[in-house]
Amino acid sequence: MILSAANDADIKVLNMYSRSPEAFCLFAQDETLTTPESLRGKTIAGPAGTILHELLVSYLATADMTIEDVNYVNMSIPESKAALDGGSVDVAMLAGAAAYTAKLQGCSLVTDGTGLVDAIIAVAVTEEFYNAHPEIIEKLKSAQDEIASFIAENEEEALQITADTLDLDISAVKEMFAQYDFSTEIKETDRI
């Protein structure tokens, strides 16, 4: 969204979807990869132009390094996880269930986004769409409020529905849920 705004794109932020810096991670098989400097020259896979990409760049910057100091390979999260499992990359940029699985498998956490990225996911439309379809915008906001209320009033049931839908163990869903702030409110810290 920052790039869109910088290029004068027609963007209207409606609200927030989530904030979850802890859920975005870099994982390795090699336990010695514990600092940005230890990543120099290593092959690191993950999706470009994402929060995970921002995490990698921010982490490297803490040691005055850039993405040019590593062998970065643009891959989806599932491809990155498979490449890490197969040993063809040194580090995978993972989030959500893939990060949880890597942790369970004993992969070494290099870093997560805490203190490095805000990991803000916003809900946005074009200004043109916003102005042309106020009824759809209202339905979306109403549905979001209804979902948030359901989760707040029926947390165990909501987590079980999520576990069933995603074919995950309920304990995994509970652990991941704790990493997220699903408040739709746009806070001052969300503004750039």
Go through each PLM region and give its residues:
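A bilobed periplasmic-binding-protein/Venus flytrap-type ligand-binding module shared by bacterial periplasmic
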Residues: 24-33, 120-136
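Secondary-structure end/capping motifs
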Residues: 132-192
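Short secondary-structure transition/capping segments
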Residues: 6-8, 25-26, 104-107, 122-125, ...
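Extracytoplasmic/secreted envelope proteins and their assembly/folding machinery
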Residues: 36, 53, 57-60, 77, ...
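Sec/Tat-exported extracytoplasmic proteins
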Residues: 5, 43, 48, 60-64, ...
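Short, catalytically relevant binding-site loops at active-site mouths
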Residues: 98-99, 116, 129-130
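Short, glycine-/small- and polar/acidic-enriched structural segments
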Residues: 1-66, 71-74, 90-96, 108-117
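Solvent-exposed, acidic/flexible segments
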Residues: 19, 45, 49-53, 77, ...
